[in-house]
């Protein structure tokens, strides 16, 4: 009597929907007696939970874990039925070795969300298995026995093998199957919302690439036609005028004005701009000689004035003679290293002088215009084998004259620049796609967009089935391919 009251109370409490767990996520355990609210899904299916429960939280179900076993296939009702038979057979073999407490099935929580399905221990709340929805390929419940429920999930890794996980619950197997299907529908809708925009952008990229290929093909055709026309024109010119003197170019044009042979005719020969010629005659006018000035015996010069005075006034002065018209000497190029007299040179006075040094004085070079002079010749310099534009060559070291190592940002810039350099052509480089190939790619994207619009996209479809009336636990059948002598402790 007390047991029946406990079951009735448990069923009434399990009808509370939308409670909050410790982590603040929504969870629900639908009742088997209360009528359930139906929600229409995006794929035409009927949902039993509000979408927010699975999107923002999760839905929890309490069940007992029967066990798991590997399966040869990832889907199929026959595969799940055979796996459940194998699990029950293994449990019955171990029942004789177990006590009454250990023989009980483990009680677990099944947490279903839009991201994954988690199997956790009901006492410790520690997750036992975590299955992303993408790894679950098949889900089935028994239409006759409402307690049996199983799903097939693939193990982690690319080469993970599928395994069947079986559970028993208090007439909630169908609800668990519908909840997992609802999670798949919502994940599928989220996938469409995220990928529809990317597919449309990919379609536009393919259209632009196709246009580029068409323009490049047209440009190549025009280049070939132009080269053919130029070859035809050059052939016609060769037949008419003969081979050209300058290959590829026409003869140069002659200048219209003649080249001048001398200075302009309107400049007189006595001008300072005229240069002496070989046939010029020497000047006929010579400079007058001046009278010698004699000195007296006492050393005083006689009073000789250039102009004598008279009572009537000063005598007129004789105008100075006009200098002869002499041509200037030819220009002389300046010397690069003029010779400096050692007597009047400051360099000679400071020769061999070195201030503030205890070492013997070294003779300084006498040529102050020597280009090889280096004032930093005594300093220690760092020599680099090759200049690295992305390295830290511009940062000189402060210890022992060593170079500072390149920074991480400089190495990153160098790697990015090297990656952007055009790679040499090799056999591994794929050839360029043609316009027909881009047409095929555009058609594939359009098919995916059409499938998204109609809801027939193949991604995220969960296959469901019926276990077909699993026999009772006492009337199980022996699986055909699950007999293991080592596990059964039997002699071969």
Swiss-Prot record:
The PTB domain is required for interaction with trim-21. PROSITE patterns: PID. It comes from the Eukaryota. Disulfide bonds: none annotated. One of its GO terms (molecular function) is clathrin adaptor activity. Residues 55-215 form the PID domain. The lineage of its organism: Eukaryota, Metazoa, Ecdysozoa, Nematoda, Chromadorea. The gene is ced-6. SMART domains: PTB (SM00462). GO terms for biological process: apoptotic process involved in development; engulfment of apoptotic cell; establishment of mitotic spindle orientation; left/right axis specification; positive regulation of apoptotic process involved in development; positive regulation of distal tip cell migration; positive regulation of engulfment of apoptotic cell; programmed cell death. Residues 244-268, 313-333 have a biased composition (Pro residues). Detected in gonadal sheath cells. Residues 373-383 have a biased composition (Basic and acidic residues). InterPro entries: Adapter_Engulfment-Domain, PH-like_dom_sf, PTB/PI_dom. Its main location: cytoplasm. This is Cell death protein 6. May function as an adapter protein in a pathway that mediates recognition and phagocytosis of apoptotic cells during normal development. Promotes engulfment of cells at both early and late stages of apoptosis. Required for actin reorganization around apoptotic cells. Plays a role in protecting dopaminergic neurons from oxidative stress-induced degeneration. Mediates recruitment of E3 ubiquitin-protein ligase trim-21 to the apoptotic cell surface which promotes ubiquitination and degradation of ced-1. Belongs to the ced-6 family. It is found in: Cytoplasm. Coiled coil: none annotated. Keywords: Apoptosis, Cytoplasm, Developmental protein, Phagocytosis. CDD domains: PTB_CED-6. Residues 19-29, 300-312 have a biased composition (Low complexity).
